[in-house]
Amino acid sequence: QIEEQAGGDKAKIAEIMLGIVEKQGKHRNPVTGSGGMLLGTVEKIGDALVGKTDLKVGDKIATLVSLSLTPLRIDKIKEIRADVDQVDIDGKAILFESGIYAKIPADLPEKLALSALDVAGAPAQTAKLVKPGDTVLIIGAGGKSGMLCCYEAKKRAGVTGKVIGLCHSQRSTERLQKLGFCDYVFSADATQPVPVMEKIAELTNGEMCDITINNVNITDTEMTSILCTKNDGLVYFFSMATSFTKAALGAEGVGSDVTMIVGNGYTKGHAEITLQELRESEALRKIFTELYA
């Protein structure tokens, strides 16, 4: 969003980011309400926490709480890598005792780990929700969280299950097909519920999906998620663009008794589950390194 607002101008991106932090004391995007996460080195541990945490000064960690609520000071913006949504800065942040974090593992490059940890909640929730034999639809399957969810969904659904990936562009469709995590991959506009519903009906012989996981960060995809899911199925909205009103009234309007879950960026063990995916799948690790690290 900031890149779009700045017209791709890196100096303008830096100016917007510095302005946000200067005004709010944290990096909370006033348009989206979200903020990202950070990778940093522990400089000091509060006296009351010394000996009660597994951290020590000098440890490299990724914070798993949003920068929208992390006290932050930016002294200097050193490099902006808009293609991978990462910014290098000199600065300081405060992580509270309740703030969750992950130590950067020795066996994975920092930027690779950071790119996956940024969306760790989605694949970990997928691991919790998907059962053997489930038919699962991933909307936004070609993106960062989408690819991780596809891998995890296939792992959990097993040979008796079915994973369907819905991508936006032809490029992301081809990329996901090559990865081989999905039984079916197709390209469609997720804001158009009826054509997508018809395609899912065709792929599932009219049975529809047990679980739909929505990773698309655009508005108006609520009805697509609901209509593609069985009446007693489950929709997981990981997308920050989800409208409670559209989802609730939409399901009511079409007489769907679907269970809807608001995506929580945290679930127990989410960092470990997500990093383990990169260790297990060479194809996933390779594509994440190429695209995001």
Name each region found by the language model:
Residues 49-57, 130, 229:
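Short, well-ordered loop/turn sites that connect or cap secondary structure elements
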Residues 144-145, 220:
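Hydrophobic/small residue at the entry helix of a nucleotide-binding pocket
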Residues 136-142:
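Conserved N-terminal Rossmann-fold NAD(P)-binding element of oxidoreductases
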Residues 14-32, 36-39, 48, 61-133:
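NAD(P)H dinucleotide-binding glycine-rich loop of Rossmann-like/cofactor-binding domains
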Residues 154-220:
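Adenosine-nucleotide cofactor-binding segment
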Residues 216-281:
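Glycine-rich phosphate-binding loop and adjacent beta-alpha segment
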Residues 206, 276-293:
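C-terminal capping/lid region of NAD(P)-dependent oxidoreductase domains
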